[in-house]
Swiss-Prot record:
Binding site for Mg(2+) 4: E925, N927
Binding site for Mn(2+) 3: Q913, E925
Protein name as annotated: Carbamoyl phosphate synthase large chain
Organism: Brucella suis biovar 1 (strain 1330)
Gene expressing this chain: carB
Keyword Mitochondrion: no
Start and end residues of each stretch annotated as Carboxyphosphate synthetic domain: 1-456
Keyword rRNA processing set for record: no
Pathway it works in: Amino-acid biosynthesis; L-arginine biosynthesis; carbamoyl phosphate from bicarbonate: step 1/1; Pyrimidine metabolism; UMP biosynthesis via de novo pathway; (S)-dihydroorotate from bicarbonate: step 1/3
Enzyme Commission number: 6.3.4.16, 6.3.5.5
Binding site for Mg(2+) 3: Q913, E925
Cofactor-binding details, from the entry: Binds 4 Mg(2+) or Mn(2+) ions per subunit.
GO molecular function, one term: carbamoyl-phosphate synthase (glutamine-hydrolyzing) activity
One GO CC term on file: cytoplasm
Length: 1162
């Protein structure tokens, strides 16, 4: 049937900030949905709190709300916009849960809003563990033996009482009075949420105890309606069982967990299915997990298509997945169904399904070229699959054709355990990865080895790895333990075990990885041994065969004690180069006009390898992306790359994107003119450029927008004679090189904190003695503040040098100095020295984003950090415009920024970080590239500064580039205030201290917008998941130098009814200054103490600042308790002041919602 005409406007709910389990893939799906529905003529209303997304660009939707994604806030948007329909399937678990809450609150009914894409009943049936189990039983599909722990009975009673009150209100009032009365009733219901949750948890815990006797141990615990396995896990003993149950019940919005029999070691598969109103169902892609059951699919290495199923097994699974969609009632759109198969007897069970587009949907879309989100959006408004064209084949096939692929795709997740000292790297059913890489090859081996080097963790392939505890004598058991424990390094452990003599059968017994995959890895390991023994082949045929197995030049070089350049030269001499094939959805059955490509060294049975690159004769620019997401380098850089592609297209260049991240908008087939899905290594990029230079004109390469990843390639590209657009690699090096940068600052008469540089352990001690404590230390050339720390004393310095720095030593240096820790460190520091700075206490940190064309410059935004200097800028909340700085300071910041931009001959973007102490300005660092604040600034000032920067880099003047996008921004004309807040994954890493420092640990960000600073801050907190209390008790414990300053926020809270609780010294000070407060013990002073009060929910807000290292350690348990109880916790005075202002503003009146477009119009 054609599209629906009874719907005029559609509300799309985004996914909010990037968190573990919900990343860029929902910006990709949301962006596709916005474009697809807007081109059909619908009015699009979008809500998303994440400013770093493409979907929140003001030209993508008609009304773009950068507001917190909570049911209460979205209800206000619905009341204001009155959409006809709501599409909740594009924003992950956040959107689904919000839509269901809106339905339960009666908002959808009140405003006559229809849920499209997935009905509420279908979402409930898929996400509610009990309903799903019953549905599977009904259609004859097996599920794991399981029992539920929930509080359904008492919840139903509460809900009935609430519904009865709603009916009374409806009978009593009408019109505006009815709306007010219903809002009041809902507010009262929300205020009782904490008390109800406690009752439900107690009831469900009792049920869990009964379930344990039936299901037994080990048991898999899966909370309902959660994201990425949040709160779940595998329990091997009773203590673990009740810990995970409590965590899972707390994480589940419905206070329900499923307790399943153990299926550890079974094989895991996924099916991506699309269905339309006419019951046409197609399988987009089958996905197989290399890791057996027990590891969350988001943390598993996966391949597409599934490689170890027989055709019969595949057909059974295919039919089963379609039956699941029909029974659950997913009428339109994409869904993901997960299966497990017992390899011992072939028993197949259904694990779960997602009735929405998901992380796997994004992977399947990129793996096949089939745009699941775009098609799902069109199906939601009435189209059927046969009415839609397949874009990839240029309409030669309809969307109802099942994709067929003639290559293998491998996805490997990327982790960040090094950012969370004390966290366990063991993988379970709760997702922990922060990003992923995807690689494509004609064979599994080629695809796998490309993915390994695409991870950007320093691997060149199956690099050697040390087996833990192997030196303790029991070699066989140490190896079995290493390969039997799921960790990020498990696959390399498997290869190492084979090098040490274990057979495929022995490795399979320990790891439960399918023997077929192990045979492929064994083949690579045996080939490596032959290369070590005989060297590289000197003929084209045999060298091409090695490359076809996925070996990188760097890996071949390390196996033969050569340089990668030597291998590249041998390849060039023998004319061994990759060819480029197209992703066409149809295994080359139809010609594809879409330039979506991957490289392969395939060796055909006859003839020469054929390239499908079809290079154009246009003027072209290559944009290098950021690779897999990681902490410190995420969606913000992908946003910049996308904007560069859009801007270059506007300027009539052919935009060519190179990236390997399947989650992102940059790897969508229609973001750029040509897309190469390839690892971002010098070898892979230079091969692409070799092909692209064969026709047309290569204007240059952009390395400035993808974070540290492309910057690392700048020297190799320059050495190869490739033109680099924008700021020169030498200027980038000047800003990174401490000695050269210091000379530049002296020349410009600009300040920086007293500092030093150390090329050895001994020199580090001397520099620290010269500077004095406290000081900041960091390795050179890092992004996200990796291994950056504030050192308070000699003991801290010793721990840093002997514990932290060794973790940075690469494997090749460790191998060179196996038993010499100091030798390893000094070798590392010889190339990458340690940088020391005096730590500026009590300083205000400022971020400045600037554009420059080499001569003229313009400051786009000056952001004042709410956290003091010393906390990584990526983890700090900040405001734009500045909140407390004087106009004179702002003018001086602009002058110094302009001086730096001109001196560095910046072409494009530059970010400068300043610290202001006692009115004096210090430069902390300069980054002559795009920074992670670019999207936030662009959304605040209303100018697409990344697009402007790309035009400047292509050769336009600052003036002309701005004119192309509506002229220069006018900061003084902006009455609104934006606050950015960071979002952290601490709940995923039990035992990790939540105290912030100079090493970045946030995964995402949100933005609060308002005309009032306090309300903008409140929105940012709410968007980040921090529920600011309107009443209750504030706990205060601050260091002596903060006592005077804490009086303001505490008095403000006391004046609006808050009780105050404080530790000894702080409580005496507050009482002496007229603030009534109650004394409570510190943790070290005996019980009952502050942690008990937090856990007993007697405290609702925490202000806690510490100075010495021991005080930081003492307060760790308080920080952990506040995290587990989801309490707002502020560790700086600026944060406490802002929180008090925000709470007072919320108490005075409710939040108002406005679209971004209104802010710009005003």
């Amino acid at each position: 049937m054609p599209k629906r005409t009874d719907i005029k406007s559609i509300l799309i709910i985004g996914a909010g900030p990037i968190v573990i389990g919900q990343a860029c893939e929902f910006d990709y799906s949301g962006t596709q949905a916005c474009k697809a529905l807007k081109e059909e003529g619908y009015r699009i209303i979008l809500v998303n709190s994440n400013p770093a997304t493409i979907m929140t660009d003001p030209d993508l939707a008609d009304a773009t709300y950068i507001e917190p994604i909570t049911p209460e806030v979205v209800a206000k948007i619905i009341a204001k916009e009155r959409p006809d329909a709501i599409l909740p399937t594009m924003g992950g678990q956040t959107a689904l849960n919000t839509a269901l809450s809106l339905r339960r609150m009666g908002v959808l009914e009140r405003y006559n809003v229809e849920m499209i894409g997935a009905k509420a009943e279908a979402i409930d049936k898929a996400e509610d563990r009990a309903l799903f189990r019953e549905a599977m039983k009904k259609i004859g599909l097996d599920t794991p033996g399981s029992m539920l722990a929930n509080a359904t009975e008492i919840k139903d009673e509460d809900r009935k009482r609430h519904e009865a009150k709603r009916a009374e209100v409806k009978a009593q009032f009408s019109g505006d009075e009815l709306d007010k009365a219903l809002d009041k009733l809902e507010t009262e219901w929300q205020l009782g949420e904490v008390e109800r949750k406690q009752r439900y948890m107690s009831h469900a815990l009792a049920k869990a105890a009964q379930a344990l006797d039936v299901v037994g141990l080990p048991a898999i615990i899966r909370p309902s309606f959660t994201l990425g396995g949040t709160g779940g896990g595998i329990a091997y003993n009773r203590q673990e069982f009740f810990e995970i149950i409590e965590r899972g019940l707390d994480a589940s919005p419905t206070t329900e967990v499923l307790i399943e029999e153990s299926v550890l070691g079974w094989k895991e598969y996924e099916m991506e299915v699309v269905r339309d109103h006419a019951d046409n169902c197609i399988i987009i892609c089958s996905i197989e997990n290399l890791d057996p059951m027990g590891v969350h699919t988001g943390d598993s290495i996966t391949v597409a298509p599934a490689l170890t199923l027989t055709d019969k097994e595949y057909q059974i699974m295919r039919n089963a997945s379609i039956a699941v969609l029909r029974e659950i009632g997913v009428e339109t759109g994409g869904s993901n169904v997960q299966f497990a198969i017992n390899p011992a007897n072939g028993r197949m069970i259904v694990i779960e399904m997602n009735p929405r587009v998901s992380r796997s949907s994004a992977l399947a879309s990129k793996a096949t070229g089939f745009p699941i989100a775009k098609v799902a959006a069109k199906l939601a408004v009435g189209y059927t699959l046969d009415e839609l064209d397949n874009d990839i084949t240029g309409g030669a096939t309809p969307a109802s054709f099942e994709p067929s692929i003639d290559y293998v795709v491998t996805k490997i997740p990327r982790f960040a355990f090094e950012k969370f000292p004390g966290s366990s790297p063991i993988l379970t059913t709760a997702m922990k990865s922060v990003g992923e890489v995807m690689a494509i090859g004609r064979t599994f081996q080629e695809s796998l080895q490309k993915a390994l080097r695409g991870l950007e963790t320093g691997l060149t392939g199956f690099d050697e790895i040390a087996i833990p505890n192997i030196e303790e004598g029991d070699e066989k058991n140490a190896i079995r333990a290493a390969i039997g424990t799921p960790t990020p390094d498990c696959l390399r452990m498997v290869a190492q075990a084979m090098r040490l003599g274990l057979s495929v059968e022995q490795v399979h017994d320990a790891s439960k990885i399918d023997p077929w995959f192990l045979e492929q890895i064994e083949s690579i390991v045996k080939t490596e041994e032959r290369i070590r023994e005989h060297g590289l082949p000197q003929d084209a045929e045999n060298l091409r065969m090695l490359k076809a197995m996925g070996f990188s030049d760097a890996r071949l070089a390390s196996l033969t004690a050569k340089d990668a350049e030597d291998v590249a030269k041998l390849r060039a001499d023998l004319d061994v180069h990759p060819v480029y094939k197209r992703i066409d959805t149809c295994a080359a059955e139809f010609a594809s006009p879409t330039a979506y490509m991957y490289s392969t060294y395939e060796t055909p049975f006859v003839g020469q390898p054929r390239s499908e690159a079809e290079v154009s004769d246009r003027k072209k620019v290559v944009i290098l992306g950021g690779g897999p997401n990681r902490i410190g380098q995420g969606i913000e850089f992908d946003y910049c790359c996308c904007h560069a592609a859009f801007a270059l297209g506007d300027a009539d260049y052919e935009a060519i994107m190179v990236n390997c991240n399947p989650e992102t908008v940059s790897t969508d087939y229609d973001t750029s003119d040509r897309l190469y899905f390839e690892p971002l290594t010098a070898e892979d990029v230079l091969e692409i450029l070799r092909v692209e230079k064969q026709k047309g004109t290569l204007h240059g390469v952009i390395v400035q927008f993808g974070g540290q990843t492309p910057l690392k390639l700048a020297n190799a590209l320059e050495k190869a004679g490739i033109p680099i657009l924008g700021t020169s690699p030498d200027a980038i090096d000047l800003a990174e090189d401490r000695d050269r940068f210091q000379k530049l600052l002296i020349k410009l008469d600009l300040n920086q904190p007293k500092n030093g540089i150390a090329y050895s352990v001994e020199q580090a001690r001397l520099v620290a003695a010269d500077l004095g404590f406290p000081l900041v230390v960091r390795p050179s050339y890092v992004l996200g503040g990796r291994a950056m720390q504030i050192i308070h004393d000699e003991r801290g310095l010793q721990a840093y040098l002997l514990d932290t720095v060794p973790e940075l030593v690469p494997e090749d240096i460790k191998a060179k100095y196996p038993n010499d820790k100091t030798g390893q460190i000094n070798t590392l520091l010889g190339k990458n020295p340690l940088l020391f700075d005096t730590y500026l206490t009590e300083a205000i940190e400022v971020d400045v984003d600037c554009l420059c064309d080499g001569k003229d410059s313009l400051v786009a935004g000056i952001m004042e950090h709410i956290e003091e200097a010393g906390i990584h800028s990526g983890d700090s909340a900040c405001s734009l415009p500045v909140h407390t700085l004087s106009p004179e300071i702002v003018a001086e910041l602009e002058r110094q920024t302009a001086a730096l931009a001109t001196a560095l001959h910046v072409g494009g973007l530059m970010n400068v970080q300043f610290a202001i102490k006692d009115g004096e300005i210090f430069i902390l660092e300069v980054n002559p590239r795009a920074s992670r604040t670019v999207p936030f600034v662009a959304k605040t000032v209303g100018t697409p500064i990344a697009k402007v920067a790309a035009r400047i880099m292509a050769g336009e003047s600052l003036e002309a580039a701005f004119d192309a996008y509506g002229g220069k921004p006018q900061p003084t004309a902006r009455p609104h205030i934006a606050v950015k807040e960071a979002v952290f994954p601490f709940a995923r890493f039990p035992g990790v201290d939540t105290l912030l420092g100079p090493e970045m640990r946030s995964t995402g960000e949100v933005m609060g917008l308002d005309y009032d600073y306090a309300l903008a801050f409140a929105k940012a907190q709410l968007g980040a998941g921090v529920e600011l209390p309107r009443e209750g008790t504030v706990f205060v414990s601050v260091r002596d130098e903060d006592k005077e300053r804490v009086l303001g926020p505490v008095r403000k809270l006391a004046s609006i009814g808050f009780k105050v609780m404080a530790t000894g010294g702080t409580q005496k000070f507050l009482e002496a200054n007229g603030v009534e407060s109650t004394k409570i013990n510190k943790v070290i002073e005996g019980r009952p103490h502050v942690e008990d009060a937090i856990r007993n929910r007697q405290i609702h807000l925490v202000f806690n600042t510490t100075d010495s290292a021991s005080a930081v350690s003492d307060s760790k348990s308080i920080r952990r308790a506040t995290l587990m109880q989801k309490l707002p916790y502020y560790t700086t005075m600026a944060g406490a002041e802002s929180a008090a202002e925000a709470i007072a503003a919320l108490k005075a009146g409710s939040l108002e919602v406005r679209p971004l477009q209104d802010y710009f119009r005003s």
